Amino acid sequence: MCLSAASGQGLFETTLSEGANTKGDDALTLGGFIRSAVYLGNTPDEEKPYLQSAYGQVGLQMKARAGTWATAVADIRFRYGTEWQQNISELNIREAYVDLQTGPVGFRLGKYISPWGKGTLFNPTNKIIPMDPTTRSPDPDDMNLGIWALQGSVRLGSYLQVRATWNPLYQPGKLLIDPIPMPDYVNFLDPDYPGVELDDGSYGIQLDLRAPALDAALYWFDGYHSWPGIAYDSFIMDTLTMEPVALNVLEKAYRIRMAGLDFSLPVGSWIFTAEGAWFETTESHDSVEYLPFPELSYSAEIEKSGAWLTVIAGYYGKYIIDFTPALAEPNLSAEQEQFLPLMQGGMHITSEAVDVIVQEQISAFNRLYNYQLEEYYHSTYLVLKGNFFHNTLELSVPLIYNFTTEEWIAQPSVSWMPADGLKVQAGYSGLWGGANTLNDLVGPVLNAAYISMTLTF
């Protein structure tokens, strides 16, 4: 998915897990930020300009140290305002974990964010960290959600390290369609997520090679995909008027296996990066509307850095294994117009036939969401990032084009740093696509211009 991938690592990676500030052997260091932001979009129904999001936010970031072998990190966010035409007042513990490091062996326990993958905009290997692509924040890293996990690591010499992660608590990502208005008769029932039994946990293994000439990694993941599928429950129709009464669906988690690899190779001022992954569901996807097909996904990019300009150009592709064409149009609705042509063609509409028709539509919608309606997908992307006037003015222009679906994503922004710690940022996040594409569905709701002011301390 393009938008969710647009917060990948590389150019935009700024997680607290990787970069909390410390000062010598201080027992506790404090930092954080205060941010105000406003997003202007169009209402989904009448397409009138409105405040899509307007909020004030405080982030408090702490790092504590106990001797030379124990550290603890916390990132706490407070946010108040309005979003998607609803008031918000929330407290979020984004990260809170403890690290123990003794010699080559380390342990981490708690809630943290550490995505897999080295790509800038697409990370096929990142199945372990969930995301919220509807997040209204000028910092793309805020789309990453924390997981509660136990991680152990062992250094095998100067360049190799093995990490094993066990995540017993399922943390779903947020679907792009969450802010999209649905017909009144479409009901999302309580989600079907795994419990806290030990055999419901997920685990991942990562082998890192960090050498002067090469940065590479191998990955294995066995657990629940962070994106739940949309499962069909039931459909009720008035048989006299053929009008829908209720379409009941629910989010349902499913388990996958994933194997992947990536590498990054610096050559002078150039960096060559590639990443690829294979995954399949542990259950057969045949006739199960919420399960995706097995797939191979892969990306390759070239980065060139200069004195004031960085250019990243890349390719992202997918191959859908065991592909078969969808049997219906992708839809999360069941209107009268969908059944009348069948009746006029002589088909006898029974409850069983209606269930099959609606289930096939939901299956196609899941494939639309997962980009599996076609056997192959090809996308290209370009990121331009310029720094001017001694790094007081920054311009960033990420662009993505999907050749298969003819969809666009553009997220230009300009940042001004008039004083130390102060950033004023303005930009636009836009998604466009033709009829029956995901961007055509979510773009009119998510597209927005924004301005934010952030003071970091």
Describe each model-derived feature in a short phrase.
Residues G223, V267-E283, Y290-I400:
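Detector for outer-membrane/organellar transmembrane beta-barrel domains
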Residues S36-N42, F78-T82, T102-P104, I113-P115, ...:
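Transmembrane beta-strands of outer-membrane beta-barrel pores
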Residues L28, T68-A72, P104-F107, Y159-V162, ...:
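Repeated loop/turn-to-beta-strand initiation elements of outer-membrane beta-barrel proteins
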Residues M143-V311, Y315-G317, T324, G443:
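Signature for the C-terminal beta-barrel architecture of outer-membrane proteins
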